[in-house]
């Protein structure tokens, strides 16, 4: 079962479960405060020296079946080459968790995402499933990660998908999502149009 949620709602519930073993996979530099175990392909043990950190070395995750009560995968799946295998691994090590993904708009805006992200996502609210395809860069990116994080605070529902799952992560891969025939939008053209419009507006005044 997969459905929409919010990170604040998830965190509030996790705070009420101090006995749970919670994994933050792909924790990066800003792990979830509720996680009892952190994991990443980078060796961040020194950075997280006061927490239980595990370095991921192989495709198969170094954890036992159903080892965790909850697993957090925030901005991770878009980086994974073998999407199907990784999702199966999440289902193997836990029965429930939280998934956070950039929306297609959010992904296209961020400059640093241009080469790092492999997958593009939308969410089917009728069938409650993730729709994934290989990423297509339609909009020339012009926003830095730090600015993107700030924008997420204001326009979170437009830039981020927040999902919770139990027992099974429903998804399908659909390359029609790519809109490959769409014309690429140049940032310079956007600026020119904006300045042109601004100048015309000022002249009218």
Model regions: which residues?
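Long, low-complexity intrinsically disordered regions enriched in Ser/Thr, Asp/Glu, Pro/Gly
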Residues: 1-18, 190-204
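Conserved SAM-binding loop
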Residues: 9, 15-106
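S-adenosyl-L-methionine-dependent methyltransferase catalytic module, highlighting the catalytic core
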Residues: 84-92, 96-205
